[in-house]
Amino acid sequence: MFENLNLDKTFQFLLIILAFLMPLTVFGGNLIIVIICVLWLFSGNYKSKFDQIINNKLMLASIVFFCIHLVGLLWTEDLAWGLHIVHKMWYFIGLFPILYTIVRKDYISHYISAFLLAISITEVCSYLVWFEIIEPFKHATVSNPTPFMSHISYNPILAFAIYLVLHEIFFNKKITNFVFSLYSFFSISMIFNMFITGGRAGQVAFFAMLVVLIIQILDKQRIKSLITIFIVIPGIFFTAYQASDLFQKRVNLAFNQALEYQPGS
């Protein structure tokens, strides 16, 4: 069906576009995902794809995870809600296995560059709204400047972007002075942006990411890793708590909710 189409290059082009659109538009990202899935389903070579998927433990775990949700429908008290959850989990059996068969190591730097470019656009817009240089638009408000998506989605994506940039700073031995300076500024601005927006899940992911990064940097030095974690994490947390009214309110709210929580309520 696609004899005259270079499918591999087409998939790489679509993946780069997907990486760029993910932080900017849910609709655009979903549209690219649909195109990728349709192309994959009609591109043939099914036995090779199937063998590639079932011979990977992570992909098998992804499929089993989805199937567990599916089997759980047999004893759910709310079938409509159960179907809703299963619908949200489709990518464990559909998207992830498909991506596994088409992602190419040689193009990973292109995926990351496209993703970080999009993050830089969202960040610039976020600061423009926060400094009241432009009027808030779409999801953004001055007090919670996340224009292209809600803070619930934005902050976890921002945490992932921070990890990618910091990983490049600490582990890329060939990084130039200019790129090092650019990435250092970018990481600081993203970390600050993390705490002027209100996504608690993303902020938790940020601190978890820092723990992982510190352990990676201080590989096999457990004592140094623990000491660094116990200094850096509380240091950033309390600095953000004092500097950001929004972060302070979110922390206080989470603390109060934890105190008021009663099992079974």
Describe every region a protein language model picked out:
Residues 11-16, 135-147:
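Juxtamembrane membrane-water interface segments that cap and precede transmembrane helices
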Residues 75-83, 193-197:
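Membrane-interface helix caps and helix-loop-helix hairpins in membrane proteins
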Residues 20, 98-99, 150, 251:
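Generic structural signal for conserved hydrophobic packing positions in ordered secondary structure
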Residues 1-80, 101-113, 168-181, 223-230:
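Transmembrane signal-anchor hairpin modules in multi-pass inner-membrane enzymes, especially those
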Residues 70, 107-138, 149-219, 228-246:
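Alpha-helical transmembrane segments of multi-pass inner-membrane proteins
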